[in-house]
Regions:
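A cross-family signal for N-terminal binding/gating loops and helix N-caps
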Residues: 1-115
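Short coil/turn linker and secondary-structure boundary residues
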Residues: 2, 36-37, 48, 140-143, ...
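Alpha-helical architecture
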Residues: 56, 171-172
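Phosphate/anion-contacting hairpin/loop surfaces
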Residues: 70-170, 176-177, 181-183, 191
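Short, intrinsically disordered, charge-balanced linker/junction segments flanking boundaries
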Residues: 190-196
């Protein structure tokens, strides 16, 4: 599953193709991925300008002019590719195309269909059910030793389990938690509250 660093790389890679661009069309080739697409997904995005791409944990955000926000999760095998010029015919696992008036296509491919796309608004983004319980983002300027220490205080669970809990630290998965603990010389079985 793509973890926070990979999702941030995807966000940065898609910026030139999407930011500041108007979506000429949005093509959805199946009714659902992990969850059904909102019934008005295509209508609300088509003709709207992508003001900026954001990210929180493993979620990508397409902030649209007018206040809509598309929430995208890549799931286990999902990826997004920017195609300039005429896009090739979609393959079996190419589920969504975002086509801009500038002629670019951003294609979402997901073999296992564990990804998701949904909509919310700027006003409701922080309280959206997928976002509201996510912990601090380790790439945010506000993240610090003190923030992590406070999140681990009193936690009797293992440090590995605590770091994998998205309410403790957002966006970390098994790869980065295991590597970080190994490089720090901290046993993954050590109680979280003992790490200061």
């Amino acid at each position: 599953m793509p973890e926070l660093p990979e999702v941030e790389t995807v966000r940065r890679g898609l910026q030139p193709a999407l930011e500041g661009q108007t979506l000429k069309s949005v093509i959805v080739r199946r009714a659902k991925l992990r969850i059904p697409f909102p019934k008005d997904f295509v209508r609300r995005l088509t003709g709207s300008k992508v003001e900026r791409l954001g990210r929180r944990a493993k979620y990508l955000f397409m902030h649209m002019q007018g206040g809509d926000v598309a929430i995208i999760h890549l799931g286990m095998t999902g990826h997004m590719t920017a195609i300039s010029g005429k896009a090739p015919a979609p393959g079996k696992h190419d589920h969504v195309d975002f086509c801009t008036t500038a002629g670019a296509t951003v294609r979402f491919n997901d073999v296992r269909r564990f990804g998701l796309m949904t909509l919310t608004t700027e006003e409701e983004l922080e309280t959206h059910r997928l976002i509201k319980n996510i912990g601090p983002d380790p790439l945010a300027n506000s993240f610090s030793h003190e923030v992590l220490s406070a999140a681990l205080k009193g936690r009797a669970t293992s440090i590995k389990a605590a770091l994998l809990d998205q309410k403790t630290v957002a966006g970390l998965g098994n790869i980065y938690v295991s590597e970080s603990l190994f490089r720090s010389g901290i046993s993954p079985k050590r109680q979280a509250k003992s790490v200061q």
